[in-house]
């Protein structure tokens, strides 16, 4: 007798069948995953403190705004019955080990039917085994590593999704923009080599930049003195400095680069999309700065949803919406659409609904989920002048 080897996807489905929890259901989905009762519980496994706390707080704001909006309108339509959403927030403290334990708590104790977060690739990766084991999908609003949704053999993790484009798309788009719009022929790269985020985006920029990369330097997250490496870079003839990293180091690098007399444009990725970066760099140094992102209020004319969303966000939180809040806001509505498409709030059905998302109309643009659970969507580039967003470019 021949024994067929089970695929990763099928194995995950079988594995999680023993973890059924929640309300009784007559659907086949009741044999696995978690089921919603009168309230749809969505877990939020988020970096609310620690190194990535700035991103996590943004995402919490976006999630709560979406939940409040949906509940005010009566809730989610689950096969003709309206059910309200309850967001259950857990702080993973920007720690991979805590992210993993929070994932277990949310799925096995809180009995959530879907999870949003973690925000970062490393923390999100730590939760993947739990998602596949318990059949509770998680949607990261901002993880960017190219292979985030895939296992080591290139197979799709069935219960892992993201609402943000891959990091290599940021790198390639930045390379194109630098060459075609900024007219840069020579680029220098200063990247964070302590995370998949920085390494992956830097690699893509280097691969797709049509000019010459004259220098590539690396640093570790937590470094505070970049004067030596910036002096070395300054000695090279370059037209743009590319810095794919998180806001803490980006802010310090911008400050020290300008103080060292580097006047060329500085580009980065979505890690720059936090007001804390400008507080670190100083507004006077944050001019001719560009970064790739999924959202900016500056492109409201190209998306009718942006203006009304930003007004609601500003009314609630007293400021314009940042990128990660918009991404997490869309994430809640993507889960809502998945539930309404499948006419079920069972976790397995939500997974199926997320995989089917097509032409989702969000504040971060139109989104279609591809076969590898990555979204297809346009990218935006923001320009900072004196620390303030001054212009937005939509790159398709």
What are these regions, as identified by a protein language model?
Residues 28-32, 54-58, 76-151, 219-224:
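Beta-alpha junction/loop-to-helix N-cap segments that form part of ligand/metal-binding clefts
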Residues 34-64, 90-96, 119-122, 190-199, ...:
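Extracytoplasmic "Venus flytrap"
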Residues 55-78, 203-208:
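Short, polar/charged alpha-helical segment
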Residues 1-41, 72, 395-396:
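Short, low-complexity disordered leader/linker segments with a strong preference
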Residues 99, 162-187, 199-201, 225-227, ...:
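Hydrophobic alpha-helical segments within soluble ligand-binding/sensing domains
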Residues 315-322, 336-389:
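Segments of small-molecule ligand-sensing domains
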């Amino acid at each position: 007798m021949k024994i067929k080897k089970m695929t990763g996807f099928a194995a995950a489905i079988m594995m999680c069948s023993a973890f059924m929890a929640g309300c009784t259901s007559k659907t086949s989905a009741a044999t696995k995953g978690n089921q919603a009762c009168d309230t749809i519980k969505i877990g939020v496994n988020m970096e609310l403190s620690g190194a990535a706390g700035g991103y996590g707080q943004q995402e919490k704001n976006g999630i709560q705004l979406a939940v409040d909006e949906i509940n005010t309108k009566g809730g989610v339509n689950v096969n003709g019955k309206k059910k309200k959403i309850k967001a259950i927030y857990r702080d993973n403290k920007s720690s991979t080990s805590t992210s993993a334990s929070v994932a277990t708590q949310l799925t096995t104790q809180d009995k959530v039917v879907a999870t949003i977060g973690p925000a970062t690739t490393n923390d999100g990766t730590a939760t993947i085994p739990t998602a596949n084991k318990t059949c509770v999908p998680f949607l990261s609003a901002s993880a960017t590593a190219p292979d985030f949704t895939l296992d080591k053999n290139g197979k799709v993790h069935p219960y892992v999704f993201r609402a943000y484009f891959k990091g290599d798309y940021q790198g390639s788009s930045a390379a194109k923009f630098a060459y075609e719009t900024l007219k840069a022929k020579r680029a220098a790269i200063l990247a964070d080599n302590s995370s998949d985020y920085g390494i992956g985006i830097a690699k893509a920029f280097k691969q797709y930049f049509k000019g010459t990369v004259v220098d590539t330097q690396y640093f570790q997250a937590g470094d505070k003195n970049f004067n030596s490496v910036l002096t070395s870079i300054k000695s090279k003839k370059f037209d743009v400095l590319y810095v794919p990293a998180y806001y803490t180091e980006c802010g310090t690098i911008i400050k020290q680069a300008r103080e060292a007399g580097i006047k060329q444009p500085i580009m980065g990725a979505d890690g720059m999309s936090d007001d804390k970066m400008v507080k670190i760099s100083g507004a006077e140094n944050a001019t001719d700065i560009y970064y790739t992102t999924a959202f900016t209020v500056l492109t409201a004319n190209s998306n009718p949803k942006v203006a009304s969303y930003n007004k609601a966000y500003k009314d609630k939180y007293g400021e314009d919406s940042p990128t990660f809040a918009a991404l997490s806001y869309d994430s809640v509505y993507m889960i809502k659409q998945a539930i309404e498409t499948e006419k079920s709030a069972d976790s397995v059905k939500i997974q199926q609904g997320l995989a089917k998302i097509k032409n989702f109309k969000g504040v971060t643009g139109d989104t279609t989920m591809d076969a590898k659970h990555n979204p297809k969507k346009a990218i935006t580039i923001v320009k900072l002048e004196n620390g303030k967003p001054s212009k937005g470019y939509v790159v398709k």
